[in-house]
Amino acid sequence: MPIQEVRCSLCRRKIKVHDQYDIPIFDPNTGFAICKNCIREVNRFLDEHDQIKGQAVETQQQHKHGFASQLSKVLKKNKPHVIKEYLDEFIIKQERAKKILSVAAYNHYKRMLYDYEHDSGEDELDKSNVIIMGPTGCGKTALLSHLSRLLDIPFAVTDASSLTEAGFVGADVEVAVRNLYYAAGKDIEKTEHGIIYLDEFDKIARKSGENNSITADPGHEGVQQGLLKMLEGSVVEFTARGQRKHPEAPTIKVNTRNILFIVGGAFVGIEKIVARRVKKSASSMGFGAEIQSNEDESKRYDELIHQVRPEDLMKYGIIPEIIGRLPVICTLETLDEDSLLRILTEPKNAPVKQYEKLLAMDNVKLEFAEDALRAVAKKAIERKTGARSLKGIIEDTMLDVMFDIPKTDEPRKVVITAACINDGETPKIEPLDAKGLLELKQLNVNKPNDDDDPDDEENTPA
């Protein structure tokens, strides 16, 4: 090669070329050339890139191993019987439901561990999402809230009746994942291992089914279709809260493969579908006949709700594809008067215990007469809202007392009787004796300073 000057196409320097080693890449037809210095820099960059890529893969593998180790610890610590024992501390009755959810959560964690320890392939384990049904105020949301608290995973509730088919005004199905994302503190990894509860799921049943609810709408089948891939496991894209959805908006991506979906609702009327399936006439089961008492009606409901099968859900208006992605059916019983009475006082976060602590902070001992507790339970049954209304009934009764007692620090006792609940009689405020003072101290509640923020309350059974 004769001596000539060539300009490097990358660094734009002129190079005197004696032979091919001075300019390793050169096309005389186009004049394209790369000098040896630029080639050296490119090779160095590629070596560094490979090294960084290798480190990233190694870090990812270490992270994957660390998460698998964390899952293993959770499984060893939270066997199904341990999960149920924890739920027993907060939830009265619902023994079968607590067992079903304990096993479902345990198996879900085992499935995730299996996926981390084995590369995804033909032998991967399918996800077992849950459908939970029972009357209003029987403990559906409370069960799931305490379950997520024990497992220390994010939990979010979304009202399924607010979801709309794509193209209609309302919330898209992706909002359920977005709610979980914010419940997880905007941590995508935590989001991808959380629990989503779709409440009021029965409200999106097809009206063409045997369910004739006026809240059902033919368009709700589109909502069910929109949930299919999300339930099975897919990458869901959504915009941040407050941002309008448009093509240029930045999106957040979450893989729902390891999110446990639980859908629930009252499914009003499904017991009649079950009754027809088991070939018992409406009259023999009491439907359409005169109801003798609320207790008889509840017993009939509980008897039938535990026999719900996938075909009953199809007749109710849930599409077959959705039912196939909800293999676990969990049913809850109606809470009778005795159960509501226990809920008032027995769980760790019982409403009465909460109010005892609140009043103790004002140097006041709270006492409920037995007939007062019974009156609260009876009123909740009359309202047909289950345990959900217990705290509200007590709040209404004690409003004036809680307004007046902070006026003085003198130790006192507040006594709630049945007349306070039923007739609106003002609760009695009495001096506190030595025994009462001792019991007040045993509550171990410190009076807050004016600048202190009140502690958050536990969730009441719902």
What are these regions (language model features)?
Residues 2-28, 45, 49-93, 98-156, ...:
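AAA+ P-loop NTPase nucleotide-binding core of proteostasis motors
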Residues 38, 42-46:
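Short, structured interface segments
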Residues 12, 36-39:
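Cys/His-coordinated zinc-binding microdomains
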